[in-house]
Amino acid sequence: MAMMHPPQPPQGSYHHPQTLEEVRTLWIGDLQYWVDENYLTSCFSQTGELVSVKVIRNKITGQPEGYGFIEFISHAAAERTLQTYNGTQMPGTELTFRLNWASFGSGQKVDAGPDHSIFVGDLAPDVTDYLLQETFRVHYSSVRGAKVVTDPSTGRSKGYGFVKFAEESERNRAMAEMNGLYCSTRPMRISAATPKKNVGVQQQYVTKAVYPVTVPSAVAAPVQAYVAPPESDVTCTTISVANLDQNVTEEELKKAFSQLGEVIYVKIPATKGYGYVQFKTRPSAEEAVQRMQGQVIGQQAVRISWSKNPGQDGWVTQADPNQWNGYYGYGQGYDAYAYGATQDPSVYAYGGYGYPQYPQQGEGTQDISNSAAGGVAGAEQELYDPLATPDVDKLNAAYLSVHASAILGRPMWQRTSSLTSQLGK
């Protein structure tokens, strides 16, 4: 099969927009290292309105920087693509497209006036940028965009995001009117998001959101806030196989990788197009990453990258809502109060997608209130890492310390009697 080359505009025909309405180029971010111009061209050429594709690479290493630009024949064509593709699944992967209006050619976000943003928490796992945006835009015409923050290694939602408004008055109305209303299957928790500083380059990211959780000292324990990425974690033996032939079975996938070492687990999710392979040893997984990259399995050349081991958060084998409840540390059938503390939205930080970076509470001289602990004596702060596996017993104990008086009988998710003894009951 002949190599596909991305379309290129005629020399000297580059379009230099003077206003936002003239912009016809989209920024695309959160790209995996294997994504190149050919792949993006295959994704967007079906629009029939594509002019050029460019993936930005490091000038020294030549490696992709994780973002690029896609030019269309007109502003209207670019806008249609933005509305159609943003937040949808990228072919052959479990990731979603992250699109926004591009700059005037330097990687800077388009300056379209004042930026008034809100924080939106407790989002359901199926909420995309587009769904979040439209939830607000049907009520407020000045909505400029929305961003659901995702785990960069899995592409899955972290359960919160931001919505931008051009008008401060509409931002304030939305905070009052939309708080507690449903987006998808969950009520939203809304508050203002104050920019820490202007982030001009859209490819800047803050990949870890750290925020305080107040828990009783009786069940509090030191938490290591840093979680090594899979490629740096010597205990990780799992790889992700993208662009997988839809007809390949789990048994065939296991057979293809067993030549490199003992395979102890294989999973192809119901949506297919990708899969996971877990080896018994780390060296076998490393060899698979090196040797199987670009190899043909079935009828397609696969793309290999590191993944998290089964059982680690962010690694979900199927779209089971109960698994998502566990991922966020919620007791099955219970809401966000299972954390035992109200998360302060201002502590989230996110710098990608052209959104400003927001301050984390605790910076400078700010104090963190313990009021969310319900006045529990000895309550203390603990950094919560959304990438770490949650301690469900601890979270449930914190919940009981505040809400036990309102619960009849013993909660089904309270697995042992140790929680009662820990709380001195």
Curated annotation (Swiss-Prot):
Start and end residues of each RRM domain: 24-102, 116-195, 237-309
Subcellular location: Nucleus; Cytoplasmic granule
TM helices/strands, residue ranges: none
Record's signal peptide: none
Main location: nucleus
One Gene Ontology term of the molecular function aspect: poly(A) binding
Gene Ontology biological process terms, A to Z: cellular response to heat; mRNA splicing, via spliceosome
Recorded superkingdom: Eukaryota
GO CC annotation: cytoplasmic stress granule; nucleus; U1 snRNP
Gene3D superfamilies in alphabetical order: 3.30.70.330
Keyword tags: mRNA processing, Nucleus, Repeat, RNA-binding
CDD domains (UniProt xref): RRM1_SECp43_like, RRM2_SECp43_like
A Pfam family this chain is assigned to: RRM_1
Family: Belongs to the polyadenylate-binding RBP47 family.
PANTHER family: POLYADENYLATE-BINDING PROTEIN RBP47C-RELATED (PTHR47640:SF16), TRNA SELENOCYSTEINE 1-ASSOCIATED PROTEIN 1-RELATED-RELATED (PTHR47640)
Subunit description: Interacts with the poly(A) tail of mRNA in nucleus.
Record's function text: Heterogeneous nuclear ribonucleoprotein (hnRNP)-protein binding the poly(A) tail of mRNA and probably involved in some steps of pre-mRNA maturation.
Annotated protein name in UniProt: Polyadenylate-binding protein RBP47B'
Species annotation: Arabidopsis thaliana
